[in-house]
Amino acid sequence: MLGYYHYGVILTYLSLVSSVIGISMTLNGRHITLAIVCLMVSGCLDAFDGRVARTRKNATDEEKSFGIQIDSLCDMVCFGVLPACIGFACGLNKWYHIAILALFVLAALIRLGYYNVMEMAQKNVDESGQRFFRGLPVTSIAIILPIVYGLMLYGKLLPWAGIILSVMFLAAGFGYVSQ
């Protein structure tokens, strides 16, 4: 079988499965809250997959590189596509909303691609050896979107949902690609 199957990458795979379930929950527009839960599960799994993978002392360079690549591919679905599907299911379905969602997904793609290039060139480390990141991490949407969604539902802001979500997706997208 192609690929690698150690604990860290299995967490990444589970994150993808959670997001695919979340995407399927948005298709009929009625299970948005479950899709939000799937997004949060993916965020939690993503928070630990790298840490778990780094505990493997005997990982080959190929396994490490595979883990980086598969994590970014998974992050694209989990924190790019799934949030956009949630936004669409929440009513962002006009042409200008779709343009905003497309820009959000594009920004996530650019951010993840840039991260991979910098990681491969080992340019994500400062002079003291500390790792750092540029731009807002795409996983942050797993915190931001549930909070905004909860405020909309329970804060009686549903009449403003389109504007609030549009601004949130634009701000997150610009955050992804900003220095």
Features from the language model and the residues they span:
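Cytosolic, membrane-interface loops and tails of multi-pass inner-membrane proteins
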Residues: D49-S65, Y114-R131
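Alpha-helical transmembrane segments of integral membrane proteins
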Residues: H6-Y13, L34-V37, Q69, L73, ...
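Multi-pass membrane catalytic core of lipid/isoprenoid biosynthesis enzymes
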Residues: V9-Y13, T55-L112
